[in-house]
Structures are given as C-alpha cells and as structure tokens.
Design a protein with these regions (language model features):
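Asp-box/WD-like beta-propeller blade repeats and closely related beta-sheet repeat scaffolds
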Residues: 1-73
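Structural signature of WD-repeat beta-propeller blades
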Residues: 15, 67, 92, 123-124
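Hydrophobic beta-strand positions that form the internal "hydrophobic ladder"
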Residues: 24-25, 78, 134
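Residue-level marker for isolated small/hydroxyl-bearing positions within beta-strands
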Residues: 28, 81, 136-137
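Short, solvent-exposed loop/turn segments at conserved positions within beta-propeller repeat blades
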Residues: 33-38, 62, 85-92, 118, ...
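Beta-propeller blade signature
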Residues: 38-49, 91-102, 142
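Conserved GH/AH loop at the N-terminal boundary of individual WD40 repeats
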Residues: 57, 110-111
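Long, well-ordered mid-to-C-terminal structural blocks that present hydrophobic/aromatic surfaces
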Residues: 123-142
Length: 142
C-alpha cells in the first residue's frame, strides 16, 4: 500500500486487512457514518483507491463491529469477527461474506454455555491447513 488513511467514504476505524486473490485489499471498518455505528468491509486497490463496500448491519438487535478478517479462497468466503474497540457493547456473532460479490451471506451467533462466558467478543481468526476451517478466539479465551 502506498498511502495511509483513517476513513474511506463513510467508513471509519479500519481494523484488519488482507490481500484478496485478485491483489486488492479487503479491510474491516468498525463504524460507518457517526461514531460507534455498525461498519462493514471495504475493498480497495493496493494504491488505496476505494472500489466497493458492504455493510455489516443485520438489524438493530444485533451488535456488530467488524474486527478480524479471514479469507477462505477455497470456499470463496470471507469471515469477519465482531469486537468493539470502543468498548460500548459486546459482540456475540461472526459474519460470512461472499468473496466475489462482498454480499453478506450469514450472521451466526456463537454458542453459549450456562457456566462460562465463551461466546463474547470473537476477535482474531485463523484458517487451518485444510483451507476450509476457521478457528477464532473470544475475549474470554473460548
């Protein structure tokens, strides 16, 4: 990348970046518009030119702040985690996106347990050697 930025279009608070198979960059942006509103993912050129974006908002009842990003090229998917750097709420979901269109395909709630807080604030994910399985940590080390 040849320049730095803090905002692209209406998206702000960029967090994680990854290089797409086509050479472009995909990034999670925690917010869109005002402070601490639901963000999304943004694709831009290696030179930093905005290309397209997709919102992470599902509905008002689900607290989403895109954080980590994992590419799964074998399945043409992008996985994003949900952790709020402003610490105004807790995330309990991950999101699955189509890598080609950036369409948000699914928002999945993490499983919870009665005695442990293992579903709170998923953050950094990793693609395993099979090229299909993604594992991620949660704030409570779940």
């Amino acid at each position: 990348m040849s320049k730095s930025f803090g905002k692209i279009k209406e998206y702000s608070f960029p967090h994680s970046y990854s290089e797409l198979p086509n050479g472009n960059i995909i990034s999670t942006f925690q917010t869109k518009g005002g402070i601490n509103t639901v963000g999304g993912i943004v694709e831009f050129s290696p030179e930093g030119k905005y290309l397209r974006s997709s919102d992470a908002e599902v509905d008002e009842t689900i607290f989403m702040r895109p954080y980590g990003i994992v590419l799964v090229p074998k399945l043409n998917k992008i996985i994003t985690t949900n952790y709020d750097m402003h610490e105004t709420g807790n995330g309990y979901h991950i999101q699955i996106w189509d890598m080609t269109s950036l369409e948000l395909l699914q928002t999945l709630k993490l499983p919870s347990t009665k005695d442990l807080i293992i579903d709170q604030n998923p953050f950094e994910g990793r693609l395993l050697a099979d090229g299909e399985t993604v594992m991620f940590q949660t704030f409570s080390c779940g």
